[in-house]
Amino acid sequence: MTKDKEPIVKSFHFVCLMIIIVGTRIQFSDGNEFAVDKSKRGLIHVPKDLPLKTKVLDMSQNYIAELQVSDMSFLSELTVLRLSHNRIQLLDLSVFKFNQDLEYLDLSHNQLQKISCHPIVSFRHLDLSFNDFKALPICKEFGNLSQLNFLGLSAMKLQKLDLLPIAHLHLSYILLDLRNYYIKENETESLQILNAKTLHLVFHPTSLFAIQVNISVNTLGCLQLTNIKLNDDNCQVFIKFLSELTRGSTLLNFTLNHIETTWKCLVRVFQFLWPKPVEYLNIYNLTIIESIREEDFTYSKTTLKALTIEHITNQVFLFSQTALYTVFSEMNIMMLTISDTPFIHMLCPHAPSTFKFLNFTQNVFTDSIFEKCSTLVKLETLILQKNGLKDLFKVGLMTKDMPSLEILDVSWNSLESGRHKENCTWVESIVVLNLSSNMLTDSVFRCLPPRIKVLDLHSNKIKSVPKQVVKLEALQELNVAFNSLTDLPGCGSFSSLSVLIIDHNSVSHPSADFFQSCQKMRSIKAGDNPFQCTCELREFVKNIDQVSSEVLEGWPDSYKCDYPESYRGSPLKDFHMSELSCNITLLIVTIGATMLVLAVTVTSLCIYLDLPWYLRMVCQWTQTRRRARNIPLEELQRNLQFHAFISYSEHDSAWVKSELVPYLEKEDIQICLHERNFVPGKSIVENIINCIEKSYKSIFVLSPNFVQSEWCHYELYFAHHNLFHEGSNNLILILLEPIPQNSIPNKYHKLKALMTQRTYLQWPKEKSKRGLFWANIRAAFNMKLTLVTENNDVKS
């Protein structure tokens, strides 16, 4: 957000300080400089183990009492040395003869009484202030310090030519400590400080001002006096002291710091300075004593542009409010700052005022401030931070008669909105409004200046931007950080919005169309929000990827997931969710298509692998298993009617009937054949199962013809799953003709498994080998078996 205009008084004061800093602070371009901090270590002498490459050495606030050449000689690259707040009494500058690069030396706040001179050429900053020198410690060698910017001195007495050795130097800052200055009654001393841009005089903090010294300075731009204690009796002494210092036409900035005075004397000081060339008057830490009465003040033509008073302590409890406030309200200057004071009010000027800038930060002003005040016609900036304002409606009314007001800062108050049903009234000239750190809610958007360009609402109680708000078409910058907003405000009511600050809110699902509605956005700060990394956030993250990193401040470090737990702490840039998981329609279509493809695939596989056939086999096998469980084993054996069931292809029937059956029946082996033992009227499958159940063994005549016969395979399937004697060897395989493995269809995997796992008898082509073949057949039936005939007759 655009910063509020600062008072010119502060700006000029800042310039003066910058002159000091630039002139005295040593900055190095070498990134490898070596800085050593030995402050507050209780040292009584300089350590000997300091690194040789040390450039910056801080040994302030110790107990060092003396310096020797050996303490510094090995630090040839030393540039900055801080020795303030020690106990050094004697300074011999020759201890620095090996430190040719030394530019910054601070020996303030020691016990120095004497200085021994030695040629030195490199100092830019030399501070000998707040010591016990009787006279100003000036060496003639100081005249060679052509680059000297800052010089701090102490003295108990002054002589006019004390500073003659440095008269030709152009110093940026001279600090003169006169706390221990010996005051001679009825005698005025003189001191000529020829060339200095800033002069800072420090007096005794508790003694009444009584110094009678004529100090004249050429080219003086800034004057600062510290520790001034005045009453009505010595007020004229102080004004006389000022008359010499303010004689030159170059003095623009005058500062009084830590001043205790009566109200009468303060008004006299104001009156003295009013016609002077001073443009910026600053008073810090002002204490008003004794009484406050109405004083005459002539507001003559003045060059004073700005008066700044910060931190007032009023020790007068009963006084005329009008007497106090009138002096300030009627001043004919452009800028007035009175901050951190117990002021409860400020009067409206009687006549049209010249004020362009008013800053009343940290006072006790209420909603009645400047009520119906029509004389602040030139006022452009009004700052009322940290006061007692409570009603935003009344603040708006206050501005109604300020036609030039552009910047209004009422932050850090207790402002509330929505108390009044009437529409808020604002002067239309306001373009910058700071309402931060108040108690404002959503209703504040119905009580805003119509032409506002910069609006600061951070740290309030705003939860949303209402849709029905006055269109702020000129609004360019909006700060709503540290509120409770749950979404990014669109630009429907803010068509010119280009800067949005909305960090530290409760934004979890920002609108995906935000960037589309805010085409002019050049900076957005929306980090540190509890983003919920769900489907709703996908489009927003996608849109962020299309935005320049210069537009999105803090990206990606400040943008992290808060929910779900698995994503907590993860950067938004790493958050990705597929389109399928977030699009319900697409998900349903995808699942439906997948199920359809799966169904088609399964159906095709079923057809290709003859799954219906397997299902029929499983059904028959299940029925067989059920019957087998319900019949005891002894009963099953009593129900056997045949020694063997023969399964063969019709193409192999000639061999079966001419070779196999005759031989087996010759050996009294009862055979079950389908053409003579299948019961008419029953299904083929039922006959097969019935025949297998009533046979002790099943003989399968294998050949390529067998493979091609589906019924043969049924018979093999049921025989393999016969549960009458689980674990028994009730299958006999006879290989009539060789069968290539690749000729067996995949659906006959049972046959493949049997041929690889079980031993089979192969019909030999040679007659000489057939005896062994028949012997193996006989061995398979070499047991006594009780058979039951169809008439239930028992036969062994």
Curated annotation (Swiss-Prot):
GO CC entries = Golgi apparatus; membrane raft; phagocytic vesicle membrane; plasma membrane; receptor complex; Toll-like receptor 2-Toll-like receptor 6 protein complex
The TIR domain extends over 640-781
Describe what happens upon changing L194P: Impairs the ability to induce NF-kappa-B activation
Tell me the keywords, alphabetical order. Answer: Cell membrane, Cytoplasmic vesicle, Disulfide bond, Glycoprotein, Golgi apparatus, Immunity, Inflammatory response, Innate immunity, Leucine-rich repeat, Membrane, NAD, Receptor, Repeat, Signal, Transmembrane, Transmembrane helix
Task: Tell where it localizes.
Answer: Cell membrane; Cytoplasmic vesicle, Phagosome membrane; Membrane raft; Golgi apparatus
Mutation: Q708H; reported impact is: Impairs the ability to induce NF-kappa-B activation
Glycosylated residues? Answer: N144, N186, N214, N253, N285, N359, N423, N434, N583
Q: What is this protein called?
A: Toll-like receptor 6
Q: Which organism is it from?
A: Homo sapiens (Human)
Classification from the root reads: Eukaryota, Metazoa, Chordata, Craniata, Vertebrata
